[in-house]
Amino acid sequence: MTTTPAPRPWRGVLVATALPLDDDLAVNYDRYAEHCAWLVANGCDGVVPNGSLGEYQVLTPEERARVVETAVAAVGGERVMPGVAAYGSAEARRWAEQAREAGCGAVMLLPPNAYRADERAVVAHYAEVAEAGLPVVAYNNPIDTKVDLVPELLARLHGEGHVQAVKEFSGDVRRAYRIAELAPELDLLIGADDVLVELAVAGAKGWVAGYPNALPRASVELYRAAVAGDLAAALPLYRRLHPLLRWDSRVEFVQAIKLSMDIVGRHGGRCRPPRVPLTPEQEAAVREATERAVAAGLA
């Protein structure tokens, strides 16, 4: 008797989508739907609404729900993996239930981050959200959350059935090998654009990506070459894109990626407060790197 493997919709290039805002900072849902469809048409495998790049922290509950529904309508639920982060476990579970009702294939979840949660609290948090019934991808971002999903804790979460993959944003590529030793069935996803090749070579199964919002085709080409082990193709492209990719690990990543989108003819636009515009020096650096990528035919 053969069994069909469970789908893993987080594999491949999933874009943590930037959210188009009008001049009055209202969400432009039509532009967002078009953007999601454009990303998939240009080779990306899916979208991740309501991540940090999508400014979920400054959305109303109604806006946050509608963003998910808009993405599902644009590209199909199996391609949509929304972020469901919240200060409380019950609220995060409600967002996971909303994602399930909208037809999403999985959800992405940060650990508790209202305080420096210990291991018992982290496990309880993920267990609560897993009860919503969708596969959960853990998101490890100890830089911002101050809670580190170390390999041993990830192995426990996976072993207890609470998570099926992890978006790894610690920047420590050595962890890839320890995670594979402790939890070989836990899918590792590249979480920071500027360690893409390093984690791809280490066995990553997907990339939750920022810069494909502006440069989808070149980003997908880079990812495919890297996971195939074709470093002769990947490394020259990586070097050309890295001046942009490294912005994904900076505090100003939302503003930088939105500016690059504007430069290549997409609609990045403004950010909601408390994010402020880039400084003139930052804007010049992003603009120069983006224009260089455009001139090289990467847009």
Across the structure, where does each feature detected by a protein language model lie?
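Catalytic alpha/beta core domains of metabolic enzymes, predominantly
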Residues: 132, 143-251
